[in-house]
Amino acid sequence: MLIDYLNHQLREREAQGLTRQRRIAESPCAPRQRVSQRGQPARDLLAFCSNDYLGLANHPALVRALAEGAQLYGAGSGASHLISGHSEAHAALEADLAAWLAPCIPNAQALYFCTGYMANLALLTALGGANATIFADKLNHASLVDGALLAKATLQRYAHKSLAVLARQLAACDTPIKLIVTDAVFSMDGDVADLPELLALAERFDAWLVVDDAHGFGVLGEEGRGSLSHFGLCSERLICMGTLGKAAGVGGAFVAAHPSIIDWLVQTARPYIYTTAAPPAVAHALRESLRLIGGTEGDQRRKQLQQLISQLRSQLAELIAAQPALGWHLADSSTAIQPLIVGSNEAALALAAALDAQGLWVPAIRPPTVPAGTARLRITLSASHSADDVRQLVDALAQAGKDLAGAQP
C-alpha cells in the first residue's frame, strides 16, 4: 500500500513538472565544476548555483586548515556536545563568533550547530513555548517555517515585509514572549528585510527580533560581519542565526544572542542536545575562514562580488528590454542571489535545460519552494566568477530565449 501510494504521488509530481533530481559534482565547488547525472558522462559546466559567495569553499588556506584540524583532533567528535564531543576547537570558534557579533549584540555569546536547519529548529522550539507568539514573514526559509510549526508557540504570519500588518499583530498580542522572525536576505528573492524598522517594532512592543542571516553573513556589513552590521544595529533584543557553509565556505551554523538565551539553548534545545557534535576539524577550519572574511582578502572578494552583481543586473536588464515577449522579470535584488522569474514550471525547466545544453548550470526553482506562477532560475554569483563568466551567462540566456521563442507553435 505504501509503495503504491508513493509511486502514485511521484507520478503526479512528475506530471506537474515538480520532480527534483540530484547531480553529482566530481570536482570541488567552483565556478567550473565537473558534473554527472543519472549515469550520463560527466561534463564540465559553468555553474551559477552555489552559495559560495566569496569563493572560499576550495580556498587553499581552508583546505590546509581542515587537514590541520583533522591531524589535531581526528576525524570525528565521537559524542554530543553535552557528553564528550565539545572540543577546544568548538569552544574557540564560539568565542570568535561571539566577538564577531559583539558590536551588534552587546555581551553576545554564540553556539555552534551542525547545520543552519538545526540551528533554526533549536532556536524556535526552545524559545517558542506555550507562553510565546512567533510573528513570521511569509517568505521565510523552510527551516524557520518548520521551527515555528514545531514550536508550542502561537504562530502568526505576515505578508512579505508588510510592517503595517506586523505592527497590528503585535499590538493585539498579549503573550509575554513575542518573537519577530525573519530572513535577513530572502533566499529565493534576494531582497533584504528592513531590519531597522523590525527592530524598532521589537522595541516598541517588547519583542525580540530573530534574524536568519544565512545569506548576509560574510557578504554584508563591515568586514563581512553580516546584515546587522550592514544596518548599523546594536541591541540586546537581537538574536542572530548565521550559516557557515555559504560565504564562510565550510559548514555548520551558529546562534549569537544574549548569554541567557545561549544558556537556555544549551539546556533545552533538543536539536543541539541530542545529536553528535560536528567534527572539530570543521570548527578549526572555520576559525581560518573568519580570518579570511574579516581581512583584506575578504574586502577584495566582496568588492569583486558587488561588481559582478552590478554587471549582471545591467546586462540582464538590457536583454529583457530587447526581448519583452519572453515575459522574463529580474527580481529586485542587490545581493548575490539574482532570480530570473519566468512564470510556469515548464518555462523554467525548459530554460534551465537550454542553458545546460550550452554548458551552464543554473537551476530551475519551482513551487512549493516559491509561489505558484513564479518559477524561476535562481542565479547566484560568487567572487570567484569573472566578468567573462557573467557575459557568457547573459549571452547563453539570450540564445536560449531566441531558441525557445522559435520553438513555440
Curated annotation (Swiss-Prot):
It is an enzyme of class 2 (transferase). Its cofactor is pyridoxal 5'-phosphate. One of its GO terms (molecular function) is pyridoxal phosphate binding. HAMAP family: BioF_aminotrans_2 (MF_01693). Keywords: Biotin biosynthesis, Pyridoxal phosphate, Transferase. It catalyses: 6-carboxyhexanoyl-[ACP] + L-alanine + H(+) = (8S)-8-amino-7-oxononanoate + holo-[ACP] + CO2. Homodimer. Belongs to the class-II pyridoxal-phosphate-dependent aminotransferase family. BioF subfamily. The gene is bioF. It comes from Polaromonas naphthalenivorans (strain CJ2). Disulfide bonds: none annotated. Pyridoxal 5'-phosphate binds at G116, Y117, S187, H215, T243. Pathway: Cofactor biosynthesis; biotin biosynthesis. Catalyzes the decarboxylative condensation of pimeloyl-[acyl-carrier protein] and L-alanine to produce 8-amino-7-oxononanoate (AON), [acyl-carrier protein], and carbon dioxide. Substrate binds at R20, H141, T369. CDD domains: KBL_like. PANTHER family: 8-AMINO-7-OXONONANOATE SYNTHASE, CLASS II AMINOTRANSFERASE/8-AMINO-7-OXONONANOATE SYNTHASE. The keyword Cell inner membrane does not apply. The lineage of its organism: Bacteria, Pseudomonadati, Pseudomonadota, Betaproteobacteria, Burkholderiales. This is 8-amino-7-oxononanoate synthase. The modification N6-(pyridoxal phosphate)lysine is found at K246. Its EC number is 2.3.1.47. SUPFAM superfamilies: PLP-dependent transferases. GO terms for biological process: biotin biosynthetic process. The keyword Transferase applies.
